[in-house]
From Swiss-Prot:
Keyword terms, alphabetized: Methylation, Ribonucleoprotein, Ribosomal protein, RNA-binding, rRNA-binding
Biological processes, Gene Ontology terms: translation
Identification of the protein by name: Large ribosomal subunit protein uL11
PROSITE patterns from the UniProt entry: RIBOSOMAL_L11
Taxonomic source organism: Corynebacterium aurimucosum (strain ATCC 700975 / DSM 44827 / CIP 107346 / CN-1) (Corynebacterium nigricans)
Pfam families per UniProt: Ribosomal_L11, Ribosomal_L11_N
Protein's gene: rplK
Record function comment: Forms part of the ribosomal stalk which helps the ribosome interact with GTP-bound translation factors.
């Protein structure tokens, strides 16, 4: 078995799927760790080609020999909620001004998408987490079942 490489850095970025380029924020973040920026951009764009239009968070692990691995995460719940509600941005005063609404089924669908990144035992609890995020953005959730 090959010896383990020593990790020198962990970089977390949120980049538009299929649209990574050497311009900020990608270039400066990777350049500081000595990573080949174009190599990462090509690999990321190829891996996220099917998710175009979404923002896909990525965790990049940089090793001592300047090689790297990256792990894709699921799109942020806030972005998925904005898309589901059909609005551009959340409310500036979420508990006063309501800017849109989503159904409980839409919350469950988003929870299904994000389940691997959520700290929940089942889809029902995951949907409650998503509903809480929606409320904090000024989006009302219709049809929430009682506990």
């Amino acid at each position: 078995m090959a010896p383990k490489k020593k990790v020198t850095g962990l970089i977390k970025l949120q980049i538009e799927a299929g649209a990574a380029n050497p311009a900020p924020p990608v270039g400066p973040a990777l350049g500081a760790h000595g990573v080949n920026i174009m190599e990462f951009c090509k690999a990321y764009n190829a891996a996220t080609e099917s998710q175009r239009g979404n923002v896909v968070p990525v965790e990049i692990t940089v090793y001592e020999d300047r090689s790297f691995d990256f792990k894709l995460k699921t799109p942020p719940a806030a972005k998925l909620l904005l898309k589901a509600a059909g609005i551009k941005k959340g409310s500036g005063v979420p508990h006063t001004d309501k800017v849109g609404s989503v159904t409980w089924d839409q919350c469950k669908e988003i929870a299904q998408t994000k389940f691997e990144d959520l700290n929940a035992r089942d889809i029902e609890n995951g949907a409650r987490i998503i509903a809480g995020t929606a409320r904090s953005m000024g989006i009302t959730v219709d049809g929430v079942p009682a506990k």
